Amino acid sequence: MTIHLISFASLLHKQATLRSSHEAILSELEKYYTVKLVDYQDMDKLTSDDFKIIFIATGGVERLVIQHFERLPRPAILLADGMQNSLAAALEISTWLRGRGMKSEILHGELPAIIQRVHILYNNFRAQRSLFGKRIGVIGTPSSWLVASLSLIHILTLPPKR
Protein backbone atom coordinates (compact mmCIF):
# COMPACT_ATOMS: atom_id res chain seq x y z
CA MET A 1 0.00 0.00 0.00
CA THR A 2 1.61 3.18 -1.23
CA ILE A 3 0.83 6.79 -0.43
CA HIS A 4 2.21 9.51 -2.68
CA LEU A 5 2.74 12.72 -0.71
CA ILE A 6 2.81 15.61 -3.16
CA SER A 7 4.99 18.02 -1.22
CA PHE A 8 4.70 21.77 -1.31
CA ALA A 9 7.42 23.57 0.65
CA SER A 10 8.56 27.18 0.67
CA LEU A 11 11.51 27.97 -1.55
CA LEU A 12 13.24 29.14 1.62
CA HIS A 13 13.02 25.59 2.99
CA LYS A 14 15.73 23.29 1.68
CA GLN A 15 14.26 20.21 -0.03
CA ALA A 16 17.01 18.08 1.52
CA THR A 17 15.75 18.86 5.04
CA LEU A 18 12.10 18.15 4.24
CA ARG A 19 12.28 14.59 5.53
CA SER A 20 14.13 15.42 8.75
CA SER A 21 11.82 18.36 9.50
CA HIS A 22 8.73 16.15 9.33
CA GLU A 23 10.20 12.92 10.69
CA ALA A 24 7.42 12.31 13.23
CA ILE A 25 4.53 12.18 10.78
CA LEU A 26 6.49 10.49 8.01
CA SER A 27 7.74 7.75 10.34
CA GLU A 28 4.23 7.11 11.62
CA LEU A 29 2.83 6.84 8.10
CA GLU A 30 5.67 4.49 7.13
CA LYS A 31 4.58 2.04 9.83
CA TYR A 32 1.49 1.31 7.72
CA TYR A 33 2.28 2.44 4.18
CA THR A 34 5.06 2.83 1.70
CA VAL A 35 5.43 6.61 1.59
CA LYS A 36 6.79 8.31 -1.50
CA LEU A 37 7.55 12.02 -1.32
CA VAL A 38 6.81 13.57 -4.70
CA ASP A 39 7.81 17.13 -5.52
CA TYR A 40 4.81 19.12 -6.75
CA GLN A 41 6.58 19.65 -10.08
CA ASP A 42 6.48 15.89 -10.66
CA MET A 43 2.84 15.28 -9.75
CA ASP A 44 1.91 14.78 -13.42
CA LYS A 45 4.03 11.61 -13.40
CA LEU A 46 1.54 9.98 -11.02
CA THR A 47 -1.37 7.98 -12.42
CA SER A 48 -5.05 7.91 -11.52
CA ASP A 49 -4.41 4.61 -9.71
CA ASP A 50 -1.97 6.28 -7.28
CA PHE A 51 -3.35 7.39 -3.91
CA LYS A 52 -2.27 11.02 -3.51
CA ILE A 53 -2.19 13.35 -0.53
CA ILE A 54 -1.11 16.99 -0.80
CA PHE A 55 1.56 17.50 1.85
CA ILE A 56 1.71 21.13 2.97
CA ALA A 57 5.19 21.02 4.47
CA THR A 58 5.56 24.73 5.22
CA GLY A 59 3.69 27.98 5.19
CA GLY A 60 4.14 30.41 2.34
CA VAL A 61 3.05 27.92 -0.33
CA GLU A 62 -0.52 29.11 -0.79
CA ARG A 63 0.14 30.90 -4.09
CA LEU A 64 2.20 27.96 -5.36
CA VAL A 65 -0.61 25.49 -4.67
CA ILE A 66 -3.30 27.59 -6.35
CA GLN A 67 -1.06 28.05 -9.40
CA HIS A 68 -1.28 24.27 -9.82
CA PHE A 69 -5.02 24.09 -9.11
CA GLU A 70 -5.88 22.20 -12.31
CA ARG A 71 -3.28 19.51 -11.59
CA LEU A 72 -4.28 18.84 -7.97
CA PRO A 73 -5.86 15.48 -7.09
CA ARG A 74 -9.58 15.52 -6.38
CA PRO A 75 -10.83 15.57 -3.75
CA ALA A 76 -7.93 17.47 -2.22
CA ILE A 77 -6.61 15.76 0.90
CA LEU A 78 -4.25 18.20 2.62
CA LEU A 79 -1.80 16.90 5.21
CA ALA A 80 -0.36 19.47 7.63
CA ASP A 81 1.67 18.54 10.68
CA GLY A 82 1.81 22.08 12.06
CA MET A 83 5.53 22.47 11.48
CA GLN A 84 6.77 25.69 9.84
CA ASN A 85 3.27 27.22 9.74
CA SER A 86 1.87 24.41 7.57
CA LEU A 87 -1.54 24.34 9.26
CA ALA A 88 -2.22 28.03 8.57
CA ALA A 89 -1.27 27.49 4.92
CA ALA A 90 -3.49 24.39 4.67
CA LEU A 91 -6.45 26.32 6.11
CA GLU A 92 -5.98 29.12 3.57
CA ILE A 93 -5.62 26.65 0.70
CA SER A 94 -8.65 24.61 1.76
CA THR A 95 -10.80 27.73 1.99
CA TRP A 96 -9.68 28.84 -1.47
CA LEU A 97 -10.36 25.40 -2.98
CA ARG A 98 -13.81 25.14 -1.40
CA GLY A 99 -14.63 28.61 -2.70
CA ARG A 100 -14.10 27.18 -6.17
CA GLY A 101 -16.31 24.17 -5.57
CA MET A 102 -13.54 21.65 -4.93
CA LYS A 103 -13.92 19.25 -2.03
CA SER A 104 -11.02 19.33 0.39
CA GLU A 105 -10.11 17.90 3.75
CA ILE A 106 -7.27 18.78 6.11
CA LEU A 107 -5.53 16.00 8.01
CA HIS A 108 -4.03 17.47 11.18
CA GLY A 109 -3.91 16.62 14.85
CA GLU A 110 -2.88 13.59 16.86
CA LEU A 111 -0.93 11.03 14.84
CA PRO A 112 -3.24 8.06 15.61
CA ALA A 113 -6.26 10.06 14.42
CA ILE A 114 -4.46 11.08 11.23
CA ILE A 115 -3.45 7.47 10.53
CA GLN A 116 -6.99 6.24 11.16
CA ARG A 117 -8.40 8.82 8.74
CA VAL A 118 -5.76 7.97 6.11
CA HIS A 119 -6.80 4.29 6.38
CA ILE A 120 -10.42 5.24 5.71
CA LEU A 121 -9.54 7.53 2.80
CA TYR A 122 -7.19 4.93 1.31
CA ASN A 123 -9.83 2.19 1.50
CA ASN A 124 -12.45 4.51 -0.02
CA PHE A 125 -10.05 5.37 -2.84
CA ARG A 126 -9.40 1.68 -3.56
CA ALA A 127 -13.13 0.90 -3.52
CA GLN A 128 -13.88 3.74 -5.94
CA ARG A 129 -11.07 2.64 -8.27
CA SER A 130 -12.42 -0.91 -8.30
CA LEU A 131 -15.84 0.37 -9.47
CA PHE A 132 -14.53 2.27 -12.50
CA GLY A 133 -15.57 0.60 -15.70
CA LYS A 134 -18.18 -1.54 -13.95
CA ARG A 135 -21.81 -1.56 -14.95
CA ILE A 136 -24.14 -1.12 -12.02
CA GLY A 137 -27.89 -1.25 -12.32
CA VAL A 138 -31.21 -2.05 -10.73
CA ILE A 139 -33.46 -4.64 -12.28
CA GLY A 140 -37.14 -4.03 -11.75
CA THR A 141 -38.71 -1.58 -9.38
CA PRO A 142 -38.87 -1.54 -5.59
CA SER A 143 -41.83 -3.18 -3.93
CA SER A 144 -44.71 -0.88 -3.07
CA TRP A 145 -44.25 -1.41 0.67
CA LEU A 146 -40.77 0.18 0.48
CA VAL A 147 -42.22 3.68 0.64
CA ALA A 148 -38.99 5.38 1.73
CA SER A 149 -36.98 3.63 -1.01
CA LEU A 150 -39.12 5.03 -3.83
CA SER A 151 -37.69 8.51 -3.33
CA LEU A 152 -34.14 7.15 -3.34
CA ILE A 153 -34.29 5.65 -6.84
CA HIS A 154 -31.92 7.41 -9.20
CA ILE A 155 -29.34 6.50 -11.79
CA LEU A 156 -25.79 6.30 -10.53
CA THR A 157 -23.30 7.69 -13.00
CA LEU A 158 -19.65 7.09 -12.28
CA PRO A 159 -17.14 9.57 -13.64
CA PRO A 160 -14.89 8.29 -16.42
CA LYS A 161 -11.60 6.71 -15.40
CA ARG A 162 -8.85 9.33 -15.32
Regions found by a protein language model. Give the residues of each.
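Metallocofactor- and cofactor-centric catalytic cores in central/energy metabolism, strongly enriched
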Residues: M1-L91, R98-R100, Q116, I120-N123, ...
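Beta-rich, aromatic/charged-enriched effector core domains that present basic-aromatic interfaces
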Residues: E110, L121-A127
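Solvent-exposed, charged interface segments at domain starts and junctions
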Residues: D44-S48, A148-I153
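Conserved anion/nucleotide-ligand pocket segment
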Residues: R126-L152
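Glycine-rich beta-alpha loop elements in corrinoid/cobalamin-binding modules
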Residues: I106-I115
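Conserved small/polar residues in nucleotide/adenosyl-binding loops
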Residues: I153-P160
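Conserved thiamine diphosphate
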Residues: T95-L107
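Glycine- and other small-residue-rich loops at beta-strand/loop junctions that grip anionic moieties
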Residues: G82, L107, T141
